[in-house]
A protein has these predicted regions:
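A short coil-to-beta-strand element that immediately follows conserved catalytic motifs
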Residues: 15, 119-126
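Acidic pyrophosphate-coordinating catalytic loop
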Residues: 20-25, 41, 83, 129-140
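Acidic, metal-coordinating catalytic segment for phosphate/diphosphate chemistry
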Residues: 22-67, 81
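Conserved hydrophobic/aromatic beta-strand scaffold that supports enzyme active sites
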Residues: 29-31, 72, 142-144
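Active-site-adjacent beta-strand/loop module that shapes the phosphate/pyrophosphate-binding cleft
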Residues: 34-38, 132-153
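Conserved Nudix-box catalytic region and its N-terminal flanking loop in Nudix hydrolases
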Residues: 49-52, 61, 69-110, 152-161
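Extended, acidic-biased charged interface segments
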Residues: 105-118, 122, 145
């Protein structure tokens, strides 16, 4: 049996003309002027793109295998509000930013305590993915965390981070 599939080489070359930090507030944003190789071997013209430098995030889906329950958190998200979403309090996985010197595993165990009041008993990696690669550097390490969900609930979050979860 023959295939009509034509193998196409994935482009690899990117040329940076400039990288300018345009915001260093709550979020760091860079404006890049780049060109990149195309599938046909030619280069794109210079493209101007803004990118939010977010870094790495650890996220966990707390799961109680005995009770067959997943734990999600709910919190206000300004992006949903700014987009006009009718209910900007969103259901989410437990997650947090991986700071220098931390691992994603350490982050999700800490955040599970802070955001949901639960202890992760065992972690299983699920995937690593970019959340919004068209405009953000955020790389998410997603885990399933075995927990005992007995008695969980309530309001959580750190006062110092203005969390209301």
């Amino acid at each position: 049996m023959t295939s009509n599939y034509q193998e196409i080489k994935t482009p690899k070359a990117v040329t940076t003309e400039s990288d300018k930090k345009i915001s260093d507030g709550y979020l760091e944003i860079h404006r890049y002027r780049i060109s990149h190789e195309k599938y046909d071997g030619n280069q794109t013209p210079i493209l101007c793109r803004e990118v939010m430098d977010r870094g790495s995030v650890g996220a966990v889906i707390p799961f109680d295998p005995i009770r067959q329950e997943l734990i999600l958190i709910e919190q206000f998200r300004i992006g949903a509000w700014a987009a006009g979403w009718p209910q900007p309090w969103l259901l989410e996985c437990v997650a947090g930013i991986v700071e220098e010197g931390e691992t994603a595993e350490e982050v999700v165990c800490r955040e599970a305590q802070e955001e949901a009041g639960c202890e992760i008993l065992q972690l299983e990696p699920i995937a690593k993915y970019f959340s919004t690669p068209g405009a953000c550097t955020e790389l998410v390490s997603l885990f399933c965390g075995r927990i005992d969900s007995t008695g969980l609930g309530g309001i959580h979050g750190l006062e110092t981070e203005h969390e209301d979860i």
